[in-house]
Amino acid sequence: MNPNYLDFEQPIADLEAKIQELRKASTGPAVNVETEVRALRDKLRVRTAQIFRDLSAWQVSQLARHPQRPYTLDYINTICDEFQELAGDRAYADDKAIVGGLGRIDGRPVVIIGHQKGRDTKTKVARNFGMPRPEGYRKALRLMKLAERFRLPLLTFIDTPGAYPGIGAEERGQSEAIARNLLEMAELKIPVICTVIGEGGSGGALAIGVGDRTLMLEYGTYSVISPEGCASILWKDAGKAKDAAEQLGLTARRLKDLSLVDKVIREPTGGAHRNPQQMGKRLKAVLLNELDALEKVPLETLLQQRYERLRSYGAYEGR
């Protein structure tokens, strides 16, 4: 699958195009072509490393939204031995912007919940562009309670621009559904690991984001609002999204420095979409290590640590 190149990746695109052209148009001895191809590939590796060594917050935001970035179901297919999806909130409908079910990772039973986006127009509409409605969050809560009932660890994958702001969603209690999940997740009597795999947009992300560990992929984002939305509010100009991205502090490294994220998981050079299998293996290894650690903690201690963790967020200056 050929990746779509972002604007700052143009030098990479140019080098890869040269390599392809050289392979197609070669008329001389193969050894000469291969020598030149190897030289170009070496140059490509160096240039790619240079570009991704110091990305701006806005560039990271673009990577987090990359159309070929792995989504929740992609990771489930990579890390799970088996998975059975469960549907519906048992009250209104099945929201396909949230997926979840029972799975096994190296034989270990878990419950997995995550946001899910689409790849093409049809699936994007079906998944509502990864923006859950109240029934999606209530489906997630149903699965959380199922996990608690059977004492199964809960893994959540966060990747949403935000909760759906439509009138129907508001009428059906969008804010209540999010608030209810925050409350219930804080009290779940099982280990909970939350991983930001792409966009972490505001309350829509937090509704499945309260847990004992918060992990984040290197090029994910996590923020109260999108850079464009922030720029529109502060400066009445969505074109200032680059400035807003820097001010929001939405990157994994920045959030790790603020102790809002526990661990940053390194992505393959160029982003997770460049090597989804490798990214899945890294994620699986980290999740298993974290599960091993959490399952050794007594339940009362786990809940107390989770409470203290939530109380530690934020900072203020007294007068």
UniProtKB/Swiss-Prot annotation:
The EC number(s) this enzyme carries: 2.1.3.15
Subcellular localization(s) per the UniProt record: Cytoplasm
Keywords, alphabetical: ATP-binding, Cytoplasm, Fatty acid biosynthesis, Fatty acid metabolism, Lipid biosynthesis, Lipid metabolism, Nucleotide-binding, Transferase
SUPFAM superfamilies per UniProt: ClpP/crotonase (SSF52096)
One Gene Ontology biological process: fatty acid biosynthetic process
Pathway: Lipid metabolism; malonyl-CoA biosynthesis; malonyl-CoA from acetyl-CoA: step 1/1
InterPro entries reported for this sequence: Acetyl_CoA_COase_a_su, ClpP/crotonase-like_dom_sf, COA_CT_C
Domain of life: Bacteria
Domain CoA carboxyltransferase C-terminal residues, every copy: 32-293
Any Pfam family the entry gives: ACCA
A single MF term (Gene Ontology): carboxyl- or carbamoyltransferase activity
GO cellular component: acetyl-CoA carboxylase complex
Reaction catalysis annotation: N(6)-carboxybiotinyl-L-lysyl-[protein] + acetyl-CoA = N(6)-biotinyl-L-lysyl-[protein] + malonyl-CoA
Zinc listed as a keyword: no
Database matches in Gene3D superfamilies: 2-enoyl-CoA Hydratase, Chain A, domain 1
NCBIfam families: accA, AccA_sub, PRK05724.1
Family: Belongs to the AccA family.
PANTHER family associated with the record: ACETYL-COENZYME A CARBOXYLASE CARBOXYL TRANSFERASE SUBUNIT ALPHA, ACETYL-COENZYME A CARBOXYLASE CARBOXYL TRANSFERASE SUBUNIT ALPHA, CHLOROPLASTIC
Function: Component of the acetyl coenzyme A carboxylase (ACC) complex. First, biotin carboxylase catalyzes the carboxylation of biotin on its carrier protein (BCCP) and then the CO(2) group is transferred by the carboxyltransferase to acetyl-CoA to form malonyl-CoA.
Protein name stated in the entry: Acetyl-coenzyme A carboxylase carboxyl transferase subunit alpha
Species per Swiss-Prot/TrEMBL record: Xanthomonas oryzae pv. oryzae (strain KACC10331 / KXO85)
